[in-house]
Amino acid sequence: MALVVLAGLLMVSGGLVLVWRLDRQRSASQAAPVPSAVPFVSSSPTSTTIPLVSPSVELPQAGSMATLPVTVPPMTLTARPVVTDRVPSDDALRVQVAQMPLADKIGQMMMVQFDGQRLAESADLAALVSTYHVGGLVLLEANAHDPQQVAQLVDEAQRLAAQSGSRIPLFVSINHEGGNVVRISQGVTGFPGNMAIAATGRPEYAYAAAAMAAQELRAMGINMNLAPVLDVNDNPLNPVIGVRSFGESPDQVTLFGRETIKGFQQNGVMAVAKHFPGHGSTAVDSHVGLPTVNKTAAQLEQVELAPFRMAVTEGVEGIMTAHLVVPALETTPGLPASMSRAVVTGVLRQRMGFEGIILSDSLGMGAIAQGWGQPQAAVRAVQAGTDIVLASGPLETTTAMWNALVAAVQRGEISAGQIDASVMRILRAKHRYGLFENGLSGNLSVVGSAEHQAAADEMALAAVTLFRDQAGLVPLPSSARRLLVLSPSELPPAQDGGGTMLAQLLRDNGLEVAELIFDLDQLSSREAVYAQTVKAASGYDLILFGEWELLKRSANQSDHWQESLIAALLKSGKQVLMVVWRDPGAILLVPQVPTCLVAYGTTSAQVKAVAKVLIGQAMPQGHLPLTLVLPGH
């Protein structure tokens, strides 16, 4: 089967128009054993204007949050919105599933990771698609260099799937939450993450960021986003969720989460809400351990489950389960929610009425891989009611998982009927999102466009939050002309190659800046920066300290280097202004800092926003979506 996509990008006064045309060529001998589908795009496509805010959005009370004028241009999109009336009937899907061998059905229920940035570089990818007929791919940073390369990789994989025995297109998924949780950073627009968007108080930004991100993802051939995070972050010291959440309020998470889901799915990218039944109140990172949520059933109902009920009502395509223990929902000691039939089937499928695809989180994570091993964990997850398991690791691990699932069905440990129901859900979604008609990449002109970057800049500026300023350092006073800037290596580099973008922007505005860049993963870097900072601090008017992952490192690694350095600087009597580049809960670990500015992430848009606030070109207008109670308050 050969798919040829012709795409054009037109500029109109109202914004962007993406025009897609699909030429589908298949010889009679190549006819795929799938139900015939109406072409996804007619010869005279009509465009659908996508507003920046969906019609049903409930805006906050007037005066409750700072506002900025919306300057993002309207978006017009053709041929990408989901067309549900072109999905084959259930009877037709049953016929298709009945014709599939068990091995192919199990393949469809697996989404896999792989090495390499081209099909020719990855024998694993070729085998997984052509031999095991896996249902989907999970793109990681190692697979993604830039939009052109990603699009080429996706097209190669989809063409291989079209030529394989199953001829079923692939889900191509990615973690593209926004902020610092993205897998493609070069060439795409870096939109602020969830907590930054919530800090603006503007749900329309959630819709716009998701809609524009979806346009960029689908242009690269990516059809599923493992987002949004719908965890209610009611523990400000949570080391794994933090800024990935919309905040501590279930109402706020529900409001902003709804707009995000709509933004993705109305622009042709399946959304996967996570981490069910809720990861926001934990104090352990599930990547390294097995957290426990010690809440009553009533508390879970009111807080953790509320955003997921919304997602079910809004028709989210997928929900990802979490690797954590919830005793109020599962009585078996130590059994994670992701392997609990009481949670996956009892609560999500039956009680909440979710009819979409249930995915596991990666089975290669910490306690799961160590406690069960991925093959056994996959069997337990499917027995619980999971439709798709996320495999992690080399080909040998993935094939062991595939073999374990096939054997479990053959032994009667998993019913054939359950497998068929899962595969029907998977195929239905692939039809609904037009993958059988066009799973390939499109026109990349929209990716990283000037219009999208302008929107990201506006959102980031509206998010910057001044938590407190007891020292009167924001904007920088006229007495602070010589700055010592301590920056994490995660900040974007300066265009001139000298230090970070932040230091360059401050210098461009007439400030004398010396910068020390620290790499928290390099002991030598940390020791050198610590010594140089303490020695040189007396020669500067102000120390600008850039916090990075303080919460995560303190919880996961007992790493208190940043707290120690801040304490030493304050003890010396120097003025210290802390920029919280990641989780605002970090402020609780250094409550003695008198001035704290919160950026929520280190995208270029967020760095530019912080610089504007520091030099007085803009006022900080964000509101912290968390409650932080400092000692003595």
Spans of model-derived segments:
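Extracytoplasmic/periplasmic mature domains of Sec-exported, cell-envelope-associated bacterial proteins
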Residues: 86, 93-96, 100-103, 109, ...
